Regions:
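A conserved segment at the C-terminal end of the G1
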Residues: 24-36
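PAPS-dependent sulfation machinery
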Residues: 37-138, 173-174, 267-271, 277-287
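Short gly/pro/ser/thr-enriched loop/turn and capping motifs at secondary-structure boundaries
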Residues: 44-47, 161-164, 242-244
């Protein structure tokens, strides 16, 4: 644990966008910066924000008879306190993370990360900001903003055809494909990119920065200089190093074609239209209150869906417990009836009508054997 920093900056950076859009390579570019620490994809903070919202509802449900509302703890403060704790934990343990990275990943996962990112850089404990490149956070930007009000988001966007081809050819470190088919790949791109574009409109260019994948590949230095200007950080030439080596490559064959006849044509058309629009139109110059309200409504809807799902799960668990108890009781009854049947059969054999016939027949045969005349010699 690193407790050397008296004041810990709470300005994390989230790299969002569709999977296979360059989120990994951009994240590791940022990790070369002397003030930025790359953390492994976390994947839990989005759902954590939703769970916090549910807990806040519970903690304020009875007005002044509930602790949070009785103590005038506002929702924004509730979220931000937890976010600050997460930030402090990450920064206080940055030295431990870099120590573990000093060699194991480069050997265990070839080509997964640039080697420069796996070594302990001088002054690592002075890195005051952390970077998370979890693509799924494209769908959780509103909740992450509540946890980390000072967070900045980089939306890296790539044309949909390239993403779909890459997704269909990518095996996630031996864990299988990201999607089952082409239809899911188009839908995944559409959902994540649409969510990021809504965040661009909702929060404006001071919070969300759009970076085209093509710009990162074709003019990397210019692209990173613009990006660091957005992040209010000085440009660091070492951040270009990871771009010299392909990482997390899906190794798409040149002759690989997309165009599955089972894929919904209207979905493909919608994705293609949005992809062209993103490539040709600039990012909105300012935040939109209407889009922000839309983000908030979507977040609240998700909270409601989670609450309903939890209620259904709780009801199913109670039903399962009740059925298990009923089954246990019926098994006991069956065992009792089987035991009674065995006792009944035993009594009937020993004392019943059948047993009398059996015993009388035996005695008659015995008496008859004594009455038979003996043969005279």
């Amino acid at each position: 644990m690193d407790s050397s920093a008296a004041t810990l900056t709470n300005k994390p950076i989230f790299v969002v966008g569709s999977p296979r859009s360059g989120t990994s390579i951009l994240t590791w570019c940022l990790g070369q910066h002397p003030n930025m620490l790359v953390i492994p994809e976390s994947a839990w903070m989005g759902d954590f924000a939703i769970d916090l919202a549910i807990r806040y509802q519970i903690g304020t449900a009875r007005g002044n008879r509930s602790v949070l509302s009785a103590m005038d703890i506002e929702r924004e403060e509730f979220f931000a306190r937890f976010g600050q704790s997460i930030n402090d934990l990450i920064l206080n343990h940055r030295k431990d993370l870099e120590r573990k990275r000093s060699g194991y990943a480069a050997r265990a996962v070839p080509n997964a990360m640039p080697e420069a990112s796996m070594t302990v850089q001088p002054g690592v404990n002075r890195k005051a900001r952390w970077v998370d490149g979890t693509p799924e956070y494209s769908l959780h930007i509103c909740g992450l903003r509540k946890l980390f009000p000072g967070a900045l988001f980089i939306h890296i966007v790539r044309d949909v055809d390239s993403v779909v081809r890459s997704i269909l050819n990518f095996d996630r470190l031996g864990e299988g494909s990201l999607v089952a088919n082409e239809q899911e790949a188009y839908n995944y791109w559409l959902r994540t990119v649409s969510s990021c574009l809504l965040a661009e409109r909702a929060y404006g260019p001071r919070v969300v920065f759009r970076l085209r994948y093509s710009a990162l590949v074709d003019t990397p230095e210019a692209a990173l200089r613009s990006l660091f200007n957005f992040l209010s950080e000085p440009f660091a030439a070492e951040c270009l190093t990871p771009l010299q080596k392909r990482i997390n490559s899906s190794n798409v064959r040149d002759d690989f074609k997309i165009g599955d006849p089972e894929t919904d044509p209207s979905l493909v058309e919608q994705a293609m239209r949005l992809s062209t629009e993103v490539e040709k139109t600039p990012q909105p110059p300012e935040a939109s209150p209407g889009a922000s309200d839309e983000m908030e409504a979507a977040f609240n809807k998700r909270i409601s869906e989670y609450c309903n799902a939890q209620q259904v799960i709780a009801a199913l668990q109670k039903r399962a417990e009740r059925l298990a108890k009923e089954i246990k009781g019926k098994r006991a009854i069956i065992q009792h009836l089987r035991a009674r049947r065995q006792r009944y059969k035993l009594r009937r054999w020993c004392f019943g009508q059948d047993s009398d016939k059996h015993r009388n027949g035996w005695w008659s045969a015995l008496r008859e054997s004594f009455r038979r005349p003996t043969r005279k010699s």
